[in-house]
């Protein structure tokens, strides 16, 4: 960050921008400009940059629009991160709770959208430890599920405990939570499909 003359931090959440600003100060990065802006808003007044990065922010209603905006903002290259799994919470656990399984678009969706746009993107994978892997006790497992899904009803807790008692706690959660890093050299606007 010290070799970059100016950094723009863009987010729809003022809270997220405040956290990012505090971290920038801690890192002595004083060459950052903060802009509160949503994916759905116009970006025409945002400065074009050499590199655009969208990390953990691409669960959007219109992926094509988001990828187009990032491509058009970057003179050189775009980097985005996307879920590898289609869910933050195991579908098995969602079913054990008696809930409808909610799966989200993962990196394959973004890659397909980019391909349809005429962008031949690269994919690398980031393997990170799963912070919810320790399910060695019922209490710890329940904390992990609540952290991911919010409060549970008494009936859901009962269903979950019955399910937990039938499992090997070491096999409940994967060892890693993986992300896909998708990147491409920016494409001229007129070349996009």
Model region roles, listed by residue range:
Residues 1-41:
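Class I SAM-dependent methyltransferase SAM/SAH-binding core
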Residues 103-118, 122-124, 148:
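Short alpha-helix
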Residues 41-47:
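Short conserved loop adjoining the S-adenosyl-L-methionine
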Residues 52-53:
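A conserved beta-strand element that flanks and buttresses the S-adenosyl-L-methionine
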